[in-house]
């Protein structure tokens, strides 16, 4: 009786662990962070030129892509022409447009 109860408990734990690991929507943020390029952690860089171009950067602290004003030259890698490029490269979503 005790042995069958122990076996049943172990089987249930294994089943629950398997279900939890294979559940869609399970937190994969650590995997995304591991695959994110290092330049996604850099702050936005306007550059020395005076143009006023709207670009996107990945805000690592907030966890999403935001806009910033780019001067037009000497861009760094965390500088994207579209929100889609930013999200594809660094992950996250499109954030508020407060920086315009």
From Swiss-Prot:
Protein name stated in the entry: Spleen trypsin inhibitor I
CDD domains, A to Z: Kunitz_BPTI
Gene3D superfamilies xref list: Pancreatic trypsin inhibitor Kunitz domain
Propeptide: 22-33, 100
PROSITE patterns: BPTI_KUNITZ_1, BPTI_KUNITZ_2
SMART domains: KU
Keywords: Disulfide bond, Protease inhibitor, Secreted, Serine protease inhibitor, Signal
Presence of keyword Transmembrane helix: no
